Regions:
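Gram-negative host-targeted secretion-system effectors, predominantly Type III and Type IV
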Residues: 1-219
Length: 220
């Protein structure tokens, strides 16, 4: 039943995209806010998933810009027994390509961290003591802010790349929350040059407190 409801919503989202394009295309270009109107109704994840499905299945079509095709390949869409065809978007590919660019521009306004901000070999590194980027897919969309994505790893078997355990214990640089995530829920280790000032300040505070002697402990 969950699958059926999810499938129906995908189909409805595809229809909403077609209607928005029909409404906002003036014969030359799409009006500003066309993609946002559908995002407000179905959310970033759903709209991105439905768009990626169409571009993946029509990857042969040269009317889609190569950068949009590459973007679509970053989203996993399961084969699902041939049901993918039922929520294809039937708008003109050249116009839909503009909608995809519009969607990606709206997504970029959130300033979320992604793989492009991470060290390329993150998957083979130990996470202990490193600042990690939590995948947006792990968070509710209401929490899609960069402040909720940066976490300082403190330990856990999942910190080691080939360990059997998955748990990574860490502290959020945004609000100081301490919790546990699975290693697979992180995009990777953020590159030092991509750490914003607010996060660098919080990181320095956390590391200073970790290195401070406990109360009553003698220092020399």
């Amino acid at each position: 039943e969950v699958w059926r409801a999810n499938f129906r919503t995908n189909c409805a989202c595809a229809g909403a995209i077609e209607l928005a394009i029909h409404r906002d295309f003036d014969g030359t270009h799409l009006k500003d806010g066309c993609a946002k109107s559908v995002i407000d109704q179905y959310g970033y994840k759903r709209v991105g998933f439905v768009l990626a499905n169409t571009l993946q299945m029509q990857s042969y079509d040269g009317r889609y810009h190569e950068t949009n095709k590459r973007w679509s390949r970053t989203i996993f869409v399961p084969e699902d027994g041939g049901h993918r065809h039922t929520f294809l978007i039937n708008s003109h590919p050249a116009i839909l390509d503009g909608f995809v660019s519009n969607y990606r521009a709206e997504l970029a306004k959130l300033h979320l961290f992604g793989a492009e901000h991470c060290e390329p070999n993150s998957g083979e590194q130990d996470f202990t003591g490193r600042v990690l980027v939590l995948s947006p897919d792990t968070l509710r969309e209401s929490c899609w802010q960069p402040e909720n994505q940066l976490w300082l790893a403190s330990g856990g078997f999942g910190c080691r790349p080939h360990a059997r355990g998955r748990s990574v214990f860490c502290t959020c640089l945004g609000d100081g929350e301490t919790t546990r995530w699975n290693r697979s829920e992180f995009v990777g280790i953020i590159r030092d040059e991509c750490i914003p000032d607010w996060a660098a300040e919080k990181l320095a505070e956390l590391r200073q407190s970790q290195n401070a002697p406990a109360m009553g402990e003698m220092t020399m």
